[in-house]
Amino acid sequence: MNILDDLKARGLVYQTTDEEALYKRLESPMTLYCGFDPTADSLHIGHLLPVLMLRRFQLAGHCPIALVGGGTGLIGDPSGKTSERTLNPTEVVQEWANRIKEQLSCFLDFEGVGNPAIMANNYEWLGTINVIEFLRDIGKNFSLGSMLAKESVESRMSRGISFTEFSYQILQSYDFLKLNELYGCEMQIGGSDQWGNITSGTDLIRRMSVGEDRQVHGLTVPLVTKSDGTKFGKTEGGAVWLDPDKTSPYKFYQFWINTDDRDVVKYLNFFTFLSIEEIQGLAQEVESQPEKRNAQRMLAKEVTELVHGVEARERAEKISQALFTGGIANLTAKEVEEGFSDVPSADVEDQEMLLVDALIKVGAVSSRRQARESMESGAVYVNGIRQTDTTLTVAQLDKIESRFIVIRRGKKNYYLVKLV
């Protein structure tokens, strides 16, 4: 199957340059790229779709280039932004670029035989650019009218846009030209907001290769949306990162398992490598037995394992199951730290402290009277076990590896006692 057929079946193609020519070109191996600007020290799930697109192309026999924007990251892309980006110091951007390189290596095979992926950093050519030569040789190929007409620029004109960000599309176009010259790269892929920058690149290559038969292409993926109108990739706690130190695998797993029934089939097509037939089967289950949430569990399993590995995925599933069944006592200390990293907590040194007082210290209740009433009514659980004896001390309670006590008050309010 031509990879374009699979991508279209999954809803992953938003726009392409000459689709017929691209389809024919993809019948044999080609080199393509996608760029990732280091705007933070980690990629987030907003980057996941284009990253997985590179992986899909590599699995189909094509050669992907992951371009880290060590140069363009110093400038800032106005696409999709309503205000000017904060410019970060060069050393910070380069450090972030190195971290992003490490993350990308988890998704692409850079050592494979036949079509190994390529890692590049545009600082290599943008960092040493000669301004006069650049304006003479590259800048003359861009008309001000067409640059102003690009959606990424036009949408910012009323609010104001600096020359720095205005010139971003020229630098991105130059990236495509350099990758075409260095590696024979014939296609750029990106999000739908990148269409203007991508076509600027194809136009530049065409103008710079008059008399040559250099055909290049562009493809964009759709904007990932949520049916409830909220922004994809954002939670109450902020962005969902691919770095496990910024978003734990458990929290990552929970993001996917909480997917709306209206979105889950789309996300299975976008973010997993399950076959179309497997996804159609899960889609039928969403229609007939939505309460089982099998599609959400499969989505969370596949994406968490893809990003964080089997062990982290199994750990996330175990924590989720423990919270659902009340089997907190079966968790390890590491699993408790991961699963309860953002609940109210308190350090307790005196193990002769009454559980009643520990409830106050972690913020579960505001007074001893409220603590006693909660316990006597059966609303307090320690490591999944209901506790009604108001005379219990911390020393008398079971602990998780002698380090933690997990308290639940009511159905969903969790607190963590850390024994020090």
UniProtKB/Swiss-Prot annotation:
Keywords: Aminoacyl-tRNA synthetase, ATP-binding, Cytoplasm, Ligase, Nucleotide-binding, Protein biosynthesis, RNA-binding. Gene3D superfamilies: HUPs, RNA-binding S4 domain, Tyrosyl-Transfer RNA Synthetase. Its main location: cytoplasm. CDD domains: S4, TyrRS_core. SUPFAM superfamilies: Alpha-L RNA-binding motif, Nucleotidylyl transferase. The keyword Ribonucleoprotein does not apply. GO terms for cellular component: cytosol. L-tyrosine binds at residues 33, 168, 172. A motif ('KMSKS' region) lies at residues 231-235. It catalyses: tRNA(Tyr) + L-tyrosine + ATP = L-tyrosyl-tRNA(Tyr) + AMP + diphosphate + H(+). It is found in: Cytoplasm. Its EC number is 6.1.1.1. A motif ('HIGH' region) lies at residues 38-47. The keyword ATP-binding applies. Catalyzes the attachment of tyrosine to tRNA(Tyr) in a two-step reaction: tyrosine is first activated by ATP to form Tyr-AMP and then transferred to the acceptor end of tRNA(Tyr). Homodimer. Belongs to the class-I aminoacyl-tRNA synthetase family. TyrS type 1 subfamily. This is Tyrosine--tRNA ligase. The gene is tyrS.
